[in-house]
Amino acid sequence: MTETADPLNRPLKRGWTTGSCATAAARAAYELLMTGSCPAIVDIALPGGRRASFAVAIHEAEGGRATAGVVKDAGDDPDVTHGALIKATVQRRDAGSGIAFRAGSGVGTVTRPGLPLPPGEPAINPVPREMIIAAIDEAATALGGTRDVTVEIAIPGGEDLAKKTLNPRLGIVGGLSILGTTGIVVPFSCAAWIHSIYRGIDVARAAGLPHIAGATGSTSEKAVQQLYGLPDTALIDMGDFAGGMLKYLRRHPVGRVTVAGGFAKMTKLGQGLLDLHSRAGEVDLGWLATALHDAGAPPELVETARTANTALQVLQESDRSGFPAGDVVARAAWQTAYRALANDAVALDVAVFDRDGRLVGRCLGADHSPLPRNRR
């Protein structure tokens, strides 16, 4: 599978989701359990009707249980699960009991409400479950076997890999999630990140948290958490997707949301950009110069903004002059965010930080006056 060239003008290889790999492993393990022989290649149906083939990396059978494993290939996507072994163990259940799922080693368990699965369930998402059930049904029809089985999914090393994901924050403990809605990983896709934003908001809402914060990066996230004393569950890894977060909150509101980010990213938001990635637009220093001029900034600061190469230069001159450029940016960013949110039931504020996590600007609402300038 290949994908049209994206950042490097070369074909990017697509990959397979953990859900697809778990389905293939479950199909192979089921065949091994029913026939005593494991296929080298298994073929499964993907959501949408396509089919895909997977090589079986390992298999074993003993004591009425059969296990098979598939190595995940994420293609060119920077996925922490790339190269992981996804294992499925299948064993018979009582007649008429249907298919049950278990979390094996390295697969997490849901502990908080707000996710697509209730607390206590293995973190095998609904679409992968449907895929596995369909694969078992297909194999059972072909082989004349039972549909009453337990399917346990395991990922060796998954508990350590999960520390690099949002699972701990979402209340998924013990390992990774089995994910996927299409069965296919698209390299550098925005969809997975935006989906994680939605899940973070859902968990915060289910927990009844009155205040959440979406941050553009780790520095601003740590800073806004310290500023407001927020629990980890209240922190949304917004990244560049300010618009995605705010539009979701429009339909799924919380009591209060803080949008937090660095000076340059919040300048982009102030300009009117809701996608803060460089591909969507650069910092418009001409816009910033005009905004500072209109706010009564000293001529030296305005001229710096007009001639600067980076937003950092403007922030440094703001420090020297004592004029709160960060507050000007925060106010403009608040206006953009307010229009995107479009829900007065949600209190909105913006916090702007420098690269050291120092608060350099803030807007608590439409009528908020600039703060006195913080100095080192």
Swiss-Prot record:
Alphabetical UniProt keywords: Cobalamin biosynthesis, Methyltransferase, S-adenosyl-L-methionine, Transferase
Family matches, as InterPro entries: CbiD, CbiD_sf
Catalytic activity entry: Co-precorrin-5B + S-adenosyl-L-methionine = Co-precorrin-6A + S-adenosyl-L-homocysteine
UniProt keyword 4Fe-4S present: no
Annotated EC: 2.1.1.195
Similarity comment: family membership: Belongs to the CbiD family.
Matching HAMAP family: CbiD
NCBIfam families assigned to the protein according to its UniProt record, in alphabetical order: cbiD, PRK00075.1-1
Name recorded for this polypeptide: Cobalt-precorrin-5B C(1)-methyltransferase
